[in-house]
């Protein structure tokens, strides 16, 4: 019976800055299956200096999105129905580790662990107001991918961020990781990662200021990304 041994199930409230770290992990780690990436599953926002502050790639699951329409009511779905939705965006399901990401997983963490006991579960945490403010900073209601229609308005967005964060705090032992190697190892992945030129081949839009970084600068950048927020990891 399938138990999710090749899954990394990820959640975080809107504005928790999860997308950039997830995207970076998928680029540096050779084991990650990125066959859910298409030119349509993209959102990017840059600040006035050209720095990327919104970096959404690959499938997101949840109501009003292309996959996981009923994931706000995931407790009403069977394991088979959930797994069917997980598989849909991947051109090649049978290879590597699949990252499955949804804000709505925060409402169903114990159920997901029960359904997929061998999956690695990963969460991101930032305080409610900081999440709300950052989400607006990267586009707010103008973000077109993923879709946030379910949250309706600012009042409900703030309310649901609070609920999601509370659920995450109750389920995970949150900590600020010392750097990328600690986090990647705890996620069950190899620290033998891609070089910057290899990443640029996969994603030419990868922030070009790092193209000529020396190894120590590259590692410092990765450390900063993986240690900037509290995260929780539950391995199988």
Label every PLM stretch briefly.
Residues 1-85, 194-220, 236:
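PAPS-dependent sulfotransferase catalytic core
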Residues 84-92:
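Short, well-structured alpha-helical segments in soluble
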Residues 1-6, 156-236:
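PAPS-dependent sulfotransferases, especially Golgi type II membrane carbohydrate sulfotransferases
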């Amino acid at each position: 019976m399938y138990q999710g041994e090749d899954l990394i199930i990820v959640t975080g409230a809107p504005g928790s800055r999860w997308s950039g770290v997830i995207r970076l992990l998928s680029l540096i780690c050779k084991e990650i299956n990125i066959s859910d990436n298409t030119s349509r599953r993209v959102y990017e926002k840059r600040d006035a200096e050209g720095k990327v502050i919104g970096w959404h790639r690959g499938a997101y699951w949840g109501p009003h999105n292309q996959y996981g329409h009923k994931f706000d009511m995931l407790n009403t779905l069977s394991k088979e129905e959930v797994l069917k939705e997980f598989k849909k965006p991947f051109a090649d399901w049978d290879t590597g580790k699949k990252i499955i990401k949804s804000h709505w997983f925060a409402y169903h963490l114990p159920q997901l662990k029960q359904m997929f006991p061998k999956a690695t579960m990963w969460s991101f945490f930032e305080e409610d107001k900081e999440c709300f403010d950052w989400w607006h900073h990267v586009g707010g209601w103008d973000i077109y991918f993923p879709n946030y229609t379910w949250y309706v308005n600012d009042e409900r967005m703030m309310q649901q961020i609070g609920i999601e964060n509370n659920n995450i705090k109750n389920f995970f032992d949150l900590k600020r990781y010392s750097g990328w190697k600690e986090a990647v190892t705890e996620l069950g992945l190899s620290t033998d990662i891609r070089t910057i030129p290899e990443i640029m081949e996969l994603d030419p839009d990868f922030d070009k200021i790092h193209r000529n970084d020396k190894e120590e600068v590259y590692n410092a950048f990765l450390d900063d990304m993986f240690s900037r927020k509290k995260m929780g990891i539950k391995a199988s």
